[in-house]
Amino acid sequence: MDVLSPGQGNNTTSPPAPFETGGNTSGISDVTFSYQVITSLLLGTLIFCAVLGNACVVAAIALERSLQNVANYLIGSLAVTDLMVSVLVLPMAALYQVLNKWTLGQVTCDLFIALDVLCCTSSILHLCAIALDRYWAITDPIDYVNKRTPRRAAALISLTWLIGFLISIPPMLGWRTPEDRSDPDACTISKDHGYTIYSTFGAFYIPLLLMLVLYGRIFRAARFRIRKTVKKVEKTGADTRHGASPAQQPKKSVNGESGSRNWRLGVESKAGGALCANGAVRQGDDGAALEVIEVHRVGNSKEHLPLPSEAGPTPCAPASFERKNERNAEAKRKMALARERKTVKTLGIIMGTFILCWLPFFIVALVLPFCESSCHMPTLLGAIINWLGYSNSLLNPVIYAYFNKDFQNAFKKIIKCKFCRQ
């Protein structure tokens, strides 16, 4: 979806591109050969990388069974959509940029604009579908396991294409202004004010708000779980410092005949806590050291282990035991905090990339139609904004697939042609 025409800057009317309002901007139709060569190389490289990256994601999901799940079906559908952008839209957009004017005729222009808006909108809405799937998975993990079916994924994917279709078709049915087709060298989407609001909010602003809410709640839910784990670890460490590790706490009452076949009893130490059974000591309410002694049930009778004084001295090292548990607790605490930092980083990359690529474009797309006589966009800035939005189709497979270890393993198999041998 182009915001501005490829070239704007002198004193002739510039050919506006999709989602451009024209305004009081001007441009040149003739460009230098060096500009065409450099632009062709840059845009050709971008298109090639976008095609290759998204094709690899699709191939990985199709060939690797471990990747064939609902979450990855959504990522695969996103890759297919971005592949369509790369193959059907970007070559014509690059030609428009290189030649600095539209040369393919009005019918092709209408088709180009429809495909542009349809595919780019569907790509953005796929990001919403992935966010929604992740939100359900993390906030309702038990029930959503049964609801997370291929049919639900297909419904979400169909909805993204339906909304994209509803946004891309109206200009072809007449929702445009008479000036939209006045310049044969320009290929522009409808500059109608009503359609501008309808298309920009439907394709970006509402999805952006939805993604911010969903990923905000995902972060809060993930942070709550992580901090709950940290508190549990800290509580376990506190219990250990008082001499009661989870493995040594009774699971049933002492007289629980219907309970487990093993019990643990505390008896007052005769050695003031210097000796212990099974390597654990804990304090009683009155400060006396209690030795933990195993009691095993055999049939209907109880066999008592001999007291330490009877079985001989069994030295223990409660201090060492405590230090070890403290180290374990600290390690788990650090792991939990690392997970929280990774969550923040991942969500930051997802939202940061999406906003960086598309927000400048849609700000211009929304503002320009309402300030035709007073707005001016520099040539270079207009081109950067246009292609920054398109580059999101290149970055999506990197963010959603290449950072995933399962996908990395599948890509290695593809490179080494292991699937070919199979």
From Swiss-Prot:
Tell me the GO BP annotations in alphabetical order.
adenylate cyclase-inhibiting serotonin receptor signaling pathway; behavioral fear response; chemical synaptic transmission; exploration behavior; G protein-coupled receptor signaling pathway, coupled to cyclic nucleotide second messenger; gamma-aminobutyric acid signaling pathway; regulation of behavior; regulation of dopamine metabolic process
Q: Which residues bind 1D-myo-inositol 4-phosphate?
A: 314, 345-346, 352, 403-405
The record's section on PROSITE patterns has: G_PROTEIN_RECEP_F1_1 (PS00237), G_PROTEIN_RECEP_F1_2 (PS50262)
Binding-site residues, serotonin: 116, 120
Asked whether the UniProt record includes Transferase among its keywords, one would answer no
Q: What is its main location?
A: membrane
Superkingdom of the source?
A: Eukaryota
Which residue ranges does the entry give as Extracellular-facing topology?
1-38, 99-107, 175-193, 371-378
Short motif (DRY motif): ranges? 133-135
Residue ranges annotated as compositionally biased, kind Polar residues, are: 246-261
NADP recorded as keyword: no
Recorded hits in InterPro entries, A to Z, give: 5HT1A_rcpt (IPR000610), 5HT_rcpt (IPR002231), GPCR_Rhodpsn (IPR000276), GPCR_Rhodpsn_7TM (IPR017452)
Please list the residues annotated as glycosylated.
Answer: 10-11, 24
A Gene Ontology cellular-component term? synapse
Provide the disulphide bond pattern.
109-187
Matching entries from SUPFAM superfamilies are given as: Family A G protein-coupled receptor-like
* Record keywords: Behavior, Cell membrane, Cell projection, Disulfide bond, G-protein coupled receptor, Glycoprotein, Membrane, Receptor, Transducer, Transmembrane, Transmembrane helix
Q: Localized where? A: Cell membrane; Cell projection, Dendrite
Could you tell me the membrane topology recorded for this protein? Multi-pass membrane protein
Q: Which GO terms describe its molecular function?
A: G protein-coupled serotonin receptor activity; Gi/o-coupled serotonin receptor activity; neurotransmitter receptor activity; receptor-receptor interaction; serotonin binding; serotonin receptor activity
Ranges where the record places region Disordered: 1-22, 235-262
Q: What family name appears in the similarity comment?
A: Belongs to the G-protein coupled receptor 1 family. 5-hydroxytryptamine receptor subfamily. HTR1A sub-subfamily.
Query: What is the documented function of this protein?
Result: G-protein coupled receptor for 5-hydroxytryptamine (serotonin). Also functions as a receptor for various drugs and psychoactive substances. Ligand binding causes a conformation change that triggers signaling via guanine nucleotide-binding proteins (G proteins) and modulates the activity of downstream effectors, such as adenylate cyclase.
The protein's assembly and partners? Heterodimer; heterodimerizes with GPER1. Interacts with YIF1B. Interacts with GPR39 and GALR1.
The protein, known as = 5-hydroxytryptamine receptor 1A
Annotated source species: Pan troglodytes (Chimpanzee)
